[in-house]
Amino acid sequence: IELLTLVKRRRGPYYLAAGPAVQAGIPHPQNGAGNGPGKEEIPYRFVHYQQDGPIATVTLSRPELSNRVGLEMATELREVCQAVQADENIRLVILTGEGDQFSVGREVLPEDLSGSPASVSLDWLRSIQAASAIAAIQVPVIVAVNGDAMDHGLELAIAGDIRVASSGSKFGLTDLAAGAFPWDGGTQRLPRLVGPAWARDMILTSRIIDATEALAIGLVNRVVDSGRLIEETRTLAESILAGGAIAARYAKEAVSQGADLTLDQGLRLEADLNVL
């Protein structure tokens, strides 16, 4: 019980700035949208949100810029994650990108081109962080990687629980090659996923890897033909939904929090979750 209390304290509320949907008075799913048997969509500018029964599909929607992440997209993405957390009808989330790419990184602004990477303010970098909001979602999150996931795009992808990639996808954290530094969890989540050695390899060399290598090192869980990506992702989602909803949440909790605990502490957490 003490461990559960610690876990809940560490979670805490996730602060979210009001995005355009809230400012415009558009209802969130917890206010009534998405509770019926059909599909419901919540309009945003750069993030598409659709709920189909217990599945929420979140799509990065800036295909003309290969879904690069800017301030408004990041704000909307955090806002959508908050909506998902508040809707008890949602049991699983699918995160993907519109068009041929998942996301190739951060939006390049004129001031970035005229100055050094160091000139980008810390406050601005924090304002476009969104990976922690994805990781904080309590239900399983499947990331359907439809093309390249680079830099900030990869940081968003590895914040999910399971990654299904199209066969032509490529992956990389190339910030160091540009004299920059990962800022949305890349240096922390990547080594926890693939191990410190592979993480150092990718980060220090800015090397780009293909889907086959990503599968071999554990960066993605499955690789499928691009034409079958959504179908395979939905099949995987249905297999997860076939199990118990509460059990799935607790299993995710145990695995996620257990990574930061000793084995004995993790076993106690597992036992405590079993009796809730």
PLM-predicted stretches and their roles:
Residues 3, 10-18, 46, 164-169, ...:
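C-terminal long alpha-helix characteristic of the crotonase
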Residues 124-128, 151, 184, 208, ...:
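Glycine-rich phosphate-binding loop at the start of an alpha helix
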Residues 132, 154-155, 188, 200, ...:
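Alpha-helical segments flanking ligand/cofactor-binding loops in enzyme cores
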Residues 58, 62, 76-77, 95, ...:
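Terminal peptide-recognition signature
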Residues 128-178, 208:
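Glycine-rich beta-to-alpha active-site loop
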Residues 104-106, 145, 190, 198-207:
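Short helix- or helix-capping micro-motifs
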Residues 89, 97-133, 149, 179, ...:
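Glycine- (often His-adjacent) and acidic-residue-rich active-site loop
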Residues 10-98:
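Conserved CoA-thioester-binding segment of acyl-CoA-metabolizing enzymes
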